[in-house]
Regions:
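Conserved phosphate-donor/acceptor-positioning beta-strand/loop module used by diverse small-molecule
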Residues: 139-142, 150-178
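Small-molecule kinase domains that catalyze NTP-dependent phosphoryl transfer to phosphate-bearing small molecules
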Residues: 176-227
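Phosphate-binding P-loop
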Residues: 25-32
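ATP-dependent small-molecule kinase phosphotransfer cores
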Residues: 2-17, 58-136, 141-142
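Short hydrophobic/aromatic beta-strand immediately N-terminal to the Walker A/P-loop
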Residues: 34-36, 137
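Glycine-rich phosphate-binding P-loop
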Residues: 36-54
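Zinc-dependent deaminase catalytic domain
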Residues: 46, 68, 80-120, 198, ...
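Short glycine-/polar-rich loops that comprise or flank the Walker A/P-loop
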Residues: 32, 61-63, 154-159, 209-211
Length: 399
């Protein structure tokens, strides 16, 4: 199915998703896989794609690449007349945002990738390619809703690889290999990380959804071995077991599942000498220590939460409420005719990053306090967390 207009993409989406769903049901667990790559701008994804292709060839897999920039955005909105690489990359970001906004669909680019995969699949069927399986590498994914849609369509056949490369390396790659001045390269990196618009680039929010993480830090042999290990796991090597770091992160993720916070769910664990010392989640602390757990109400014969306990029971987030009150307090001290502009500025300001006024204890703090309650020393321990610590948690971790 070849899509050439955004209107066609929206119109054909139901049939396109139906076809993909049927194929998912009819193929074996590893007869077809779709690999999405998520990374910040400046990461050398060409090198990663080549390594994935080389490794999959050892398993007799045919590997095809779907580039969102050329196979979806350019197909729908044209290549554009760019004079340099900065204009090209910035222009592609803008076009991707426009597609999401015009379609009112944040996974529109994922639908385009699915359409391209269907097209490649049909071509392989015509050519009768004799391979054990087929893999499609999507380069690259920039919005969480794209991930959700691809997982909905392909199920366990979709895998998301998060590629980490430190900012200095990415900046150098953009300057050296793309010929972009440092100031403009820095603008691209900042824009790619997290735009204000809901239809924009949200690499930071997408990255943590990955199934596997690869570190592109210049150690080529380690990167090759990490990719080998990933595919050994996928293809059922029974002797590949988790490292302790992986196990601890799994425990942190599991701990996050017990959070009922209204903003997001975070988990953390403290570990020492290859043993888990404590777990923590971001939720409202309970009198006497620890967090609220659901309890069994014998009278109603059902599990319930304590009245006035967690925020969702109360029906509001005290931190969000306090941030609104701060903004309203500032606006009330500004002349009425100027308030509209100031309100927009304040709503997009760093005030929205304030976390001090929430009732919840953060996951990292709860993990530390759990050790304190049971007289376990945290000296020389390691903390594993599903997100980066805030400034308050960072101070407590260091102390």
């Amino acid at each position: 199915m070849k899509i050439t207009k955004i209107t066609e993409l929206n119109k054909e989406a139901p049939q396109l998703l139906k076809n993909s769903g049927e194929d998912k049901q009819s193929t074996g667990p590893l007869a077809e896989m779709v690999i999405g790559l998520v990374s910040s701008v400046g990461t050398d994804l060409e090198a990663i794609t080549k390594k994935i292709r080389d490794r999959l060839s050892l398993y007799k897999f045919e590997c095809s690449e779907v580039r969102i920039s050329s196979d979806v955005i350019a197909e729908l909105l044209g290549n554009g007349d760019y004079t340099d690489n900065y204009q090209r990359i910035d222009g592609l970001m803008t076009k991707g945002n426009k597609l999401r906004e015009d379609s009112e669909c944040n996974y529109i680019l994922a639908l385009g990738a699915i359409a391209k995969i269907n097209e490649i699949r049909a071509k392989h069927a015509r050519l009768q390619i004799n391979k054990k399986g087929i893999a499609y590498v999507i380069n690259s994914i920039k919005h969480p809703e794209e991930v959700y849609k691809l997982r909905e369509v392909y199920g366990s056949g979709f895998l998301l690889f998060g590629i980490f490369s430190d900012e200095s390396r990415r900046l150098d790659n953009i300057i050296r290999n793309k010929g972009i001045p440092e100031d403009k390269a820095a603008l691209l990196i900042a824009r790619d990380e997290d735009e204000e618009s809901g239809h924009g680039q949200h690499t930071r929010d997408t990255f943590h959804l990955a199934d596997f993480f690869l570190n592109q830090d210049g150690r080529d042999d380690k990167l090759n071995n990490d990719i080998k290990r990933v595919f050994d796991l996928l293809f059922g090597n029974p002797f590949i077991t988790p490292t302790f770091d992986e196990y601890a992160m799994y425990m942190a993720f599991s701990s996050a599942l017990r959070s009922a916070d209204l903003s997001r769910q975070v988990g953390a664990v403290l570990a020492k000498n290859y043993a888990i010392m404590s777990t923590g989640a971001n939720d409202v602390p309970k009198s006497g220590g620890g967090l609220y757990w659901p309890y069994f109400n014998a009278e109603n014969e059902s599990y319930e939460d304590y009245p006035e306990g967690r925020d969702y029971v109360r029906g509001f987030d005290s931190n969000a409420k306090q941030k609104r009150e701060i903004i309203h307090d500032i606006l009330n001290q500004i002349p009425r005719k100027s308030r509209d502009n100031f309100e927009r500025i304040l709503n997009n300001s760093l005030i929205q990053d304030i976390t001090e006024y929430g009732r919840v204890v953060h996951a990292e703090m709860e993990a530390i306090l759990a050790c304190a309650r049971t007289n376990i020393s945290t000296q020389d321990a390691y903390i594993y967390c599903t997100t980066f610590p805030c400034h308050n948690c960072a101070k407590h971790i260091i102390a």
